[in-house]
Amino acid sequence: MANKPSAEELKKNLSEMQFYVTQNHGTEPPFTGRLLHNKRDGVYHCLICDAPLFHSQTKYDSGCGWPSFYEPVSEESIRYIKDLSHGMQRIEIRCGNCDAHLGHVFPDGPHPTGERYCVNSASLRFTDGENGEEING
């Protein structure tokens, strides 16, 4: 795992929601994320360490209320953890570089993978492929 900023640094530099999601395994309310409707070409990075996580070409509208992707940039970019919280069986996804909470992956996505990476906007930074503009979720 990469060197992660201290909790004090993160609290100072992140919004309350970004800290809650990435550090406390929280979930932003559905349909509220800043990157949910983003359709621009580019790359979605981890908000904490800037590691690339998802290409915009793999993003799709799943209707679930959070940005959804059918595959990460690489298997190493994501860490998978069994999550039995809230009386459910799910697979939590975290940044493979810094361990920040991203969301969950479900086996109900489109081809070619059949997976839906359901990701909190608050855990992402989008970099536009054309002009390099960055948008924090």
Curated annotation (Swiss-Prot):
UniProt xrefs under PANTHER family: METHIONINE SULFOXIDE REDUCTASE, METHIONINE-R-SULFOXIDE REDUCTASE B1
Protein's name in the database: Peptide methionine sulfoxide reductase MsrB
Family the entry assigns: Belongs to the MsrB Met sulfoxide reductase family.
Binding-site residues for Zn(2+), renumbered to this chain: C46, C49, C95, C98
A GO biological process held by the record: response to oxidative stress
InterPro entries hit by this protein: Met_Sox_Rdtase_MsrB (IPR028427), Met_Sox_Rdtase_MsrB_dom (IPR002579), Mss4-like_sf (IPR011057)
Transmembrane segments: none
Domain of life: Bacteria
One cellular component (GO) term of this entry: cytoplasm
Note accompanying the cofactor annotation: Binds 1 zinc ion per subunit. The zinc ion is important for the structural integrity of the protein.
Native species: Escherichia coli O81 (strain ED1a)
Protein keywords: Metal-binding, Oxidoreductase, Zinc
Pfam families: SelR
GO MF terms, alphabetically ordered: peptide-methionine (R)-S-oxide reductase activity; zinc ion binding
Principal EC category: oxidoreductase
EC number: 1.8.4.12
Presence of the UniProt keyword Disulfide bond in the record: no
Cofactors, names only: Zn(2+)
Catalytic activity: L-methionyl-[protein] + [thioredoxin]-disulfide + H2O = L-methionyl-(R)-S-oxide-[protein] + [thioredoxin]-dithiol
Active site positions, chain numbering: C118 (nucleophile)
Residues annotated as domain MsrB: 7-129
